[in-house]
Structures are given as structure tokens and as C-alpha cells.
Amino acid sequence: MCMLLREIITHVPCVKCGFFVIFNNVKQRFKKYILIQSLLSPSYFNITDAKSFIETYSCIYKDRPMIVWIDSPYYVEHGCDMRRAKVYVTSHYVKKLLNGTIHVDGVLRPPFNQVAYDERASNVKKEYLFTVLASEPGDGTAIRKRVKYTLDILRQLNMRNSTLVISNVGDFDMRSYTLDEREKYRLLHKSYFYLSLSKNEGFGLPLMESMSVGTPAVYVNAFAFKEYAVGIPIDPYDVIIEETSYGKMDNYLIRDSDVRNALQEARECIKTSCYDELSAKALEKSKEFEMPNIEEKILSDFKSVMRHR
């Protein structure tokens, strides 16, 4: 952390990933300091994956003052409490996944990109019934987003042609992480609903991004989504713990019939006042993700952790 140079080195472990999106959205809101990404090693400020960070670094840095902002869909199985760190999670659900390995100072929601302010003021024509924005890990060993399942259901209901799919699996229309933020928010705005049938989400950035332009969701009513999502929920009938190559994760099970009913309900909703009401509620709820004072909060936390070195 180079306070004299007005730079804060921030550990973000990847580029084409949700953590980098959060980093850039936070960076937009910093006026006094510039955030500089560090890919390789922890720093004073960390926006990163809970499982990999805690299991790899928490015992090494257990006495190091730092800010750790974490998200993950996977259970953390071992680690050490970082007594001098400020630790934030993106959702109450992520706190559960930590299994008590590390203390948590609070829930800190990721902010949306500020292009949302311009986009929500634009008068756009809706072109898609649904947008699916979801990627699976490149090696395909962990199926968490259920993209192919989603596409199959949409085809059965003759809804595939009215759905925009941004992904890296299945017959997607656009590849993930090829759009700039303005293009992404415009496409979300052009959709009536964001559609996610994920087995679980630590937070779920695209749903929050959709809500920031008034686009509600059809979503699984569990994990982090249950904390903030607005739209048409699909209640799971059970949850199992699934072993993956990345670790253990919750798999919230949903019935095909419930998914079909929700998709058909969405198609009917856009014909009535139902849709305008959901859109207004989504926009109102998205105020929780404006985070105008994030710089002041982070700087205050820096002073606190450094004071107790």
C-alpha cells in the first residue's frame, strides 16, 4: 500500500472473472487513491476467492494487517483466523461456507458499474425475453451454472430464440467476457428478465447488474439470491452437498415442472402491470449496491488495522 503515492495495491487473482469486475467497479468509486491490481500475491487490500485464499494464505498471513473481501460458492475446509485483518463477505451465504475457519467483520455487497446510471436513463426497446449470462470453468469438470440444462428447457418451451445467451458452453450467442461493461449493461437492459438456474452462487454479479438497470430475474430462491433477488423465484425442493474438482459445494435441486412454470409465468408477466412492478422493485433494491462511500470505508479500515499492528 503506497499511501504517499496515492496507490493501493489490490490483490485480485484473475482478469476474466467476477473478482476483476468487482475490482473495477470499486476502483470507479475511488477519488483520492488509485487501485492497482496485483495478480500473484496477497496485499493490504484483497478482493478474492474465499476458498483458495483462506486455505492457501490465511495461516501464512494470520498476523498480517490487511483487508480481505471474499466470495465463493465452495465450502472452505481449513484455514487460520486472521486476527489482525478486516474480513468481509459478499453475502450471509458465503459466511456459512467459511465453516468458522476465519472471523467475519460484516457483509459488504459488491457495487454495480457506474455505467448503469446512464443505461437506466436510456429509453431502450426490449428485444429479449431472457438473458442468460453465465460461464462454467474452462475444463468443464464442475457444472454449477446449469447452462446446458437451461438451454434444453428453453428449447422445450420454444423460448430459445427469444433468449440471449452469453456463455462459454452450449450454443451461446456471445462468448463470456468479450463485451465491455457498457455493452453488457445495455443487453441486460434490453431483456425483460435475467435468467439463472445455478446450483448455487456465493453472490451472483449478473443478477445484481441486471437489477441495476431495472431488469428483474427468474432465479433459484436459495443461497445468496434469497438475500436480495427481485423477480420470479423457483423454490428448490432439496439441497445436497456435491463433490467437485474445486471442492465441496451446495447443489440446490429444482424440479423441471417448477422451472417451466416460472418461465411461462415470466412470459405472461410482460403482458401486464406485473412486469412494471417487478422492474421498479428491482431498481429500488439495487440501491443497496450503489456503495458511494466505499473509498471512505476502506480507508477507515486501513487506519484501523494499521493502528493495531
Swiss-Prot record:
Keywords: Glycosyltransferase, Transferase. It comes from the Viruses. Its EC number is 2.4.-.-. Gene3D superfamilies: Glycogen Phosphorylase B (3.40.50.2000). The keyword Transferase applies. InterPro entries: Glyco_trans_1 (IPR001296). GO terms for molecular function: glycosyltransferase activity. It holds the Pfam family Glycos_transf_1. Belongs to the glycosyltransferase group 1 family. Glycosyltransferase 4 subfamily. This is Putative glycosyltransferase 48. It comes from Sulfolobus islandicus filamentous virus (isolate Iceland/Hveragerdi).
